[in-house]
Structures are given as C-alpha cells and as structure tokens.
Amino acid sequence: MQKVVKLNNIKIGNDLPFVLITGPCQIEGKDHALFMAEKLVKLTSKLEIPFIYKSSFDKANRTSVHGIRGVGIEKGLEILSKVKSEFDCPIVTDVHSESQCTETAEVADILQIPAFLCRQTDLLQAAAKTGKIVKVKKGQFLAPWDMKNVQTKLEAFGVKDILFTERGACFGYNNLVSDMRSLAIMAELNVPVVFDATHSVQQPGGLGGSTGGERKYVELLAKAATSVGIAGMYMEVHQDPDNAPSDGPCMMKLDNLESILIKLKKYDKITKEK
C-alpha cells in the first residue's frame, strides 16, 4: 500500500488526487504574498484541488552576487505566518542551513530541502528534529534511485513523513531534462512524489548572470508527469513573471493557471482510475 502523508485535512499520496504546491518563487512583500495567496485559494477551492502555499524568504543559490535574494528569514516568516492565518492554508518553504530549521518550523508545515543540498546530512538531520514533514528536491546531479540514500538518512533521524520532488536532471551545460521514469522509480521507495514543472524547464545560468527557462514547456511536462501518476504538482506562478525578481522565465503566468489545472485534473483522474 502506497504511503500517504497527512497534513491537516490534506492527504498526499501517489494514488490519490494530486495536491497543488504553488506560489511565487520568492516573497516580494506582504501585499504581494497576500494578493497571490487570495487568488490561489479562490482558484483551488473552485477547482477542488488541495492547495499548499509555497514561497521562499531567501534564494541562497542565485547565479550572480547581484541577484535579488529575498526579504530574509525574519520578515519572510512573518509574511508566511500572515498568509497562513488569513487564508488557513498550509505552508512550505525552503531552508538552506541547519540554523534556519527550528525557526522556520514555527510557521511552515513542510520544510523543503533544495536540490543542491539534498545530500547534506546535517541539514537533513536538523530538518528532521523539527518533527515537520520534510520535502526533498532531488538533485539535478542524482539518479532517482540514489534518493534511497536520502530516505535512509531521514528515516534514521526519525522522519515519518517524507516527500520527494523531481525537478529535472543536468543534460550538458545550462540545460535540464525530465526523465519521467524517475517518478515511478522514486514512488517505488514508498514515498509520495511531487513533480516540479517550472524548475524542470530551467536553463541554469543560461542567461550568463541569471537562470533562463522555457516556460512554454511547463504545461507539456506537467501533463506528462500527471499521466505517469504523482502525489503532487509543484508550479511557481506570478501575475507578471517576466518582471519577477527570480525565476521569471520559468514561472507560469497566474492568468494561465486555471486552464492548465483543469486539464491536469482530467489527466490525473484517468491515470488513477481503478
């Protein structure tokens, strides 16, 4: 029987209707976060899709030293707490160091381990100590079966609820590809698997001083992943992605999200029919 992770009234499992994890790449301020959350709560309620809000207080791995990193942990968590209380939605955000885990866990329901840090044992252990759900993004440099080692570490540290995320694999320079087999391979570890449709179209460092991306392929990859069968769909969105402070070329335009989700629900239903 496939593992099911429970978060409030949300059930996350590879055989269950997909959960949507979405929000802007980074926190840009309280007003923007509340604006985005309100739009996303209304949309997901209308479409009856379980929703988890995601946004980052720090983009610690920006390509350039001049890249905008975010509002920082103190202000960021204050804003995420406001989103959580005002819209009664669970929160996921990423942690980049052991020192951030305890403080972040006071607000976030899920701690996300960035792909570049997925093998950092001390970070995994610190996240585990919070007792929160731990969501690990598979490194672009890892085979899907290598995530067994990450799972073993987390379980050794006492984590009961683990989520894995596929976000593409390095394919030459400045390019990623998505191997849809990895979704099934990681699911065989009895861990709910999430597909990151927006970071999978990244072109890391492709713009020289920043990361490029091919937004036009987000829907295509999302359909493919949903056809395989996933526990969650991860998509970063923005009302004006071309002017967003980070990952603009990858993020979905908010106005286009509803039509894509309607299609994904159909794919998901067919895939999971008994």
Swiss-Prot record:
The alphabetized list of GO BP terms reads: keto-3-deoxy-D-manno-octulosonic acid biosynthetic process
EC number(s) given by UniProt: 2.5.1.55
Q: Where in the cell is it found?
A: Cytoplasm
Alphabetically sorted, this entry's keywords are:
Cytoplasm, Lipopolysaccharide biosynthesis, Transferase
Please give the InterPro entries that the UniProt record associates with this protein.
Aldolase_TIM (IPR013785), DAHP1/KDSA (IPR006218), KDO8P_synthase (IPR006269)
One of the entry's Gene Ontology molecular-function terms is: 3-deoxy-8-phosphooctulonate synthase activity
Provide one Gene Ontology cellular component.
Answer: cytoplasm
Q: Which reaction does it catalyse?
A: D-arabinose 5-phosphate + phosphoenolpyruvate + H2O = 3-deoxy-alpha-D-manno-2-octulosonate-8-phosphate + phosphate
According to the UniProt entry, where is the signal peptide?
Answer: none
- The record's principal subcellular location, in a coarse class, is cytoplasm
A Pfam match: DAHP_synth_1
Instruction: Identify the pathway.
Output: Carbohydrate biosynthesis; 3-deoxy-D-manno-octulosonate biosynthesis; 3-deoxy-D-manno-octulosonate from D-ribulose 5-phosphate: step 2/3
Q: Does the keyword Lyase apply?
A: no
Highest taxon of the lineage: Bacteria
**Sequence similarity:** Belongs to the KdsA family.
HAMAP family per the UniProt record, alphabetical: KDO8P_synth
Q: What is this protein called?
A: 2-dehydro-3-deoxyphosphooctonate aldolase
**What organism, scientifically named, is this protein from?**
Rickettsia africae (strain ESF-5)
